[in-house]
């Protein structure tokens, strides 16, 4: 895994940081555990109601709108969780706190630093967790961030800037950008990380105004 090449534009420091992000694409407040075991998952009382395709319009202050097609057939629990949080207004006013040009932009943390989430965690819908999910982490994919534990994803998500298929099978992709990829490009190009993990200073974090779901 350490020998994979992730893109010609990557600087050496970013390359190293990406390896770290493989284990820390979230950093939830719960204690991280060694991957490989399935953990107890806090789930909604209601059953999954999103079985097909829905759309999410992610409006980002000063940048514009990113429209994402969510695949409820490939990752039903993940899509249901994202839709519920969006419709509840959970994401309104939150930010993208970690941005790595050529890799991804990550947001959806109420703490704004990679340590927070919602009041629930969900099942990791990916092959390493025993669940088939054929969506690949190509440019424009949206996927769930998580801690080391497979079932630790909560509210944090990331949008892939450039192909990052080394994530396939270990993270739950659940859709793709259909419009507004130039917004992702602009955000990634404007970002000025404070470290090799892509951390963005709080005052410089792009703000999610709202996420609107269209079914």
Model-inferred region functions:
Residues 1-10:
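N-terminal secretory signal peptides that target proteins for export/translocation
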Residues 6, 16-17, 37:
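Generic short amphipathic/hydrophobic targeting helices enriched at N-termini
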Residues 10-28:
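Secretory targeting signatures
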Residues 23-215:
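Cyclophilin-like peptidyl-prolyl cis-trans isomerases
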């Amino acid at each position: 895994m350490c020998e994979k090449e992730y893109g010609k534009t990557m600087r050496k420091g970013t390359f190293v940081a990406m390896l770290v992000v493989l284990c820390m694409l979230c950093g939830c407040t719960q204690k991280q555990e060694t991957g490989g075991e399935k953990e107890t998952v806090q789930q909604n009382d209601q059953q999954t109601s999103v079985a097909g395709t829905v759309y999410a319009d992610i409006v980002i202050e000063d940048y514009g709108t990113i429209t994402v097609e969510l695949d409820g057939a490939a990752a039903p629990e993940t899509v249901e969780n994202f839709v519920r949080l969006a419709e509840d207004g959970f994401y309104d006013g939150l930010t993208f706190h970690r941005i790595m040009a050529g890799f991804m932009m990550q947001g959806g943390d109420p703490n704004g630093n990679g340590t927070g989430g919602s009041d629930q965690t969900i099942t990791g819908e990916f092959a390493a967790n025993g669940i088939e999910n054929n969506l690949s982490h190509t440019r424009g994919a949206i996927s769930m961030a998580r801690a080391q534990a497979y079932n630790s994803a909560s509210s944090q998500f990331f949008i892939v800037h450039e192909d990052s298929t080394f994530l396939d099978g270990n993270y739950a992709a659940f859709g793709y950008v259909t419009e507004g990829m130039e917004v992702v490009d602009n955000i990634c190009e404007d970002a000025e990380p404070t470290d090799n993990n892509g951390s963005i200073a709080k005052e410089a974090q792009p703000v999610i105004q709202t996420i609107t779901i269209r079914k």
